[in-house]
């Protein structure tokens, strides 16, 4: 095995230099050289996002009674989205960490709802062959048939 945890920590500058080296072969997403997966506006906006991220990087949204700010963010995002979609006050939602988690939770919710409907049995999803792999992963995890 080539990689082991070092006996002692390394200076931050050394670690950051390694990170820069590691990313040197990555595609140039900052200048329109990547058609998806990364979305870049400009340096000022990237700096703003970095500062906003670092303000909450250590927070954990698992328990909203501890990090009340994260719960507030989630509630405001859900309320704003519901308003955009003309939702009623009874609308509920969840904020996810990204695309795959969103697909997983959507299929789990669909599967759970299907279990409450008499006569449904094993639910199914109709998907195009070009569907994102996350939908197939969700179908396996939650026993939903793909057609």
Q: Which residues make up each language-model segment?
A:
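PLP-dependent aspartate aminotransferase-fold enzymes
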Residues: 44-48, 61-147
């Amino acid at each position: 095995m080539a990689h082991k945890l070092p006996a002692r920590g390394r200076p931050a500058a050394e670690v950051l230099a390694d990170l820069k080296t590691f990313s040197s072969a990555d595609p140039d997403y900052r200048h329109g050289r990547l058609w998806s997966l990364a979305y870049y506006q400009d340096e000022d906006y990237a700096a703003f996002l970095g500062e906003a991220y670092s303000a909450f990087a250590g927070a954990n949204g698992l328990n909203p009674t501890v990090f009340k700010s994260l719960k507030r963010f989630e509630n405001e995002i859900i309320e704003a989205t519901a308003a955009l979609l003309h939702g009623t006050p009874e609308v509920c939602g969840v904020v996810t960490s990204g695309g795959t988690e969103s697909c997983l939770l959507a299929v789990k919710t669909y599967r759970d709802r299907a279990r409450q409907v008499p006569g449904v049995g094993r639910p199914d999803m109709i998907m195009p062959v070009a569907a994102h792999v996350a939908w197939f992963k969700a179908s396996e995890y939650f026993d939903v048939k793909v057609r």
